[in-house]
Amino acid sequence: MTDASLIGTPFIANRRQILGGVAFAAAGLVSMRATSAYAAGAPAPAPAVPAFGPTSGIDRGTIQRWARDTWASLVAMTDPRTGLPADNISGPLGSPRRSGYTSPTNIGGYMWSTVIARELGIISASECRQRLTQTLTTMKSLKHHLPSGMFYNWYDEANGNVVTVWPEDGSKIYPFLSSVDNGWFAASLMVIRNAEPGVAELANSLLSKMNFGMYYDKNARPGIAAGLLHGGFWDAQPAAGFTMGNYLGNGPDVYYTLNHYDIHVTEPRIASYIGIAHGQIPPAHYFATQRVFPDSCDWSWLEQKPVGVHRTYMGIDVFEGAFTYRGMHIVPSWGGDMFEALMPDLFVPEASWAPRSWGINHALTVRAQREFGLNDAKYGYWGFSPASRPGGGYTAWGVDAIGMDPNGYVSDMESTNFDAGFAGCRVGANPNPTWGDGVVTPHAAFLAMQYEPAAAFNNLVKIERKLKAYGEGGFYDAVAVKSGLIAKRYLSLDQAMVLGAIGNVFCDNVIRRNFIKGDVQSTIRPLIGIEEFGAGVIV
């Protein structure tokens, strides 16, 4: 059993105090040189101070009800013959309309949610074990890429077949193997093998064959001492947009995506963590992703100019830049959403293991989302993350001011874009937007609960009671706050994030405790602990 003290307490970075403690900049590992005005007159990062009791001001009965209803939606999504959850459902839980497709991420989310349902007393230990055994047995039978052990992105949840025709519109699908989706599936295997010993052998039989080195391109950034992960690959030639190769040298060449994941504050870092922990990817890869893009005019398509300093870790120059928002410096994600920033933190206790980087940035990301929703946009509610679109479809929701995407992860139905400009290079196109019908996504507020528990809880209570965005399967996926339009469906991943957050806050970090056993703690904790982000409260 992993001692919970090894995980530590999440940190809040909203006090104007000086960060004390041990200096992590060991000789040979970290060096720094200033660049831009920020380096000369920058505020020191705000401290990471221990959070107050994680359940202060929260009614446990309400949490239990939310968890029970959320679990009911996942049960309704899951095909009883295969144990595979659909991507989403609509309609009553007694006769749900399942999507006809699922992914490794969805399957992983269902499995870790099963453990949490057991921990909360919603299901028995025997039911937990039976459900996990059924799902894992099905996974062992699914077609997958044998040389790497990776799974395809889309399967039919009713029979386990690889999806080649999209159920919603009949379009052709080229079966794809995603690095990030396989990352979430592997993360779930790592949780359940420790949380439920009765399925450890089955889980390990799948996990032991998954090699994330298949995605690692050591030459992705010429002149940099480490590489990046591809978005994924096809094992049969797609229509276009690929480069051939095979980084493992095992089996025939595959068709890699042209893109790599090159941004730090985004969800693919879960695949990086697992690959590093298992010795499949070099640790220096962690520092090859960019915290923010450079502050030169070549990058002036960014919606604001970053400020920061350069530091060197493991021989790699890292621009420790940040965006400025409401008196804070925040290392941005691509879209300014809660999912990219905080979902990996459900598994890796980033805030406590890396108090000078994630420990500051996560808390400020949550604060920025809250202040944006309540103070800037004046929506009256907060929590923004990719989810269903009220009225139909799917939209990447976020807080544009803390995201790098020039088109913005929008926060309202009108797709209002923020653009502060890039000082010295171009003026802003919309530095002071007028916000419209804001869309909040409940799973984002649940992710925030580990950093602002009472505020997140109260926000969710309002979403349920005032916006009526709640059904028999828990919170609906999204709601527009002015029109009251609700996306009345449940997405399996979003429901799994809800239960993942509840599990960590109310079940003694159950996801983290089981994920970090073994190689994760010994490899990832010292690696991420040496870094200092450019994040902090401006003083």
What is each model feature region?
Residues P47-V539:
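Ser/Thr/Asn(+Pro)-rich, low-complexity disordered segments
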Residues M1-A13, A23-M32, S36-Y38:
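N-terminal secretory signal peptides
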Residues F11-I12, M32-I58:
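C-terminal segment of N-terminal export signals and the immediately downstream linker at the start
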